[in-house]
UniProtKB/Swiss-Prot annotation:
Localization per Swiss-Prot or TrEMBL: Golgi apparatus membrane
Record field: transmembrane: 14-34, 36-56, 107-129, 134-153
Membrane disposition: Multi-pass membrane protein
Role this protein plays: Golgi membrane protein involved in vesicular trafficking.
InterPro entries recorded: TVP23-like (IPR008564)
Upper classification of the organism: Eukaryota, Fungi, Dikarya, Ascomycota, Pezizomycotina
Protein's name in the database: Golgi apparatus membrane protein tvp23
A GO-annotated cellular component: Golgi membrane
Family the entry assigns: Belongs to the TVP23 family.
């Protein structure tokens, strides 16, 4: 049976990085599945809590440091100024002229990134309606990790688009373009 899969469709076979994509989706789905099946069948809170936290931590790390960079060309981190103790987020995006983002990878990435916090919110309502408030502690931790990555990658994408737009607009004006590209590039890539 032959299927015509268009560019950008949700098929992992069209991915530029299928192993990265499958690991990314595996981490995203595994914490939800362990929580769901643990809550419904096992009922051992401590075991499910520990396994889910470990999977959420692995998902957070893999998404932040590997999947974001390879699938959509985005990366973020938090820096602390040693002199003042101030903390700020640093965003990095790949150069669109050197790295072409696969539409399939991008669709999988953004869909999984935005849907997981919504699923955890839904599970919070389930825990509330079932009067299992102890499970809310795990959901709050899951939401804090997934929402942090979601907000950071959303900001990173906006800053990356803004820097690319500013760099290309100023690029046509010669010296001003070189100055703008160098300044913006240095600001967003540390």
């Amino acid at each position: 049976m032959e299927q015509n899969e268009s560019v950008g469709s949700l098929s992992w076979r069209l991915s530029s990085h299928p192993i990265t994509l499958l690991c990314f989706l595996g981490f995203r789905i595994s914490s939800l599945l362990v929580y769901l099946f643990g809550m419904l069948f096992i009922k051992n809170f401590v075991m499910i809590f520990i396994i889910t936290i470990l999977l959420l931590a692995a998902d957070f790390y893999y998404l932040k440091n590997i999947a974001g960079r390879r699938l959509v060309g985005l990366r973020w981190w938090n820096e602390v100024d040693p002199a003042s103790g101030d903390s700020h987020w640093v965003f990095e995006s790949s150069d669109p002229n050197t790295k072409i983002i696969n539409p399939t990878d991008s669709r999988f990435f953004w869909l999984a990134l935005y849907s997981q916090p919504l699923l955890w919110v839904g599970l919070a309502f389930v825990a509330i309606f079932r009067f299992e408030f102890i499970w809310l502690t795990l959901i709050v931790i899951a939401l804090s990790l997934t929402v942090t990555n979601t907000l950071a990658f959303s900001r990173c994408d906006k800053f990356g688009q803004a820097s690319n737009l500013a760099g290309s607009a100023m690029y046509s004006s010669g010296i001003a373009g070189n100055i703008a590209s160098a300044t913006i590039g240095r600001f967003f890539s540390r």
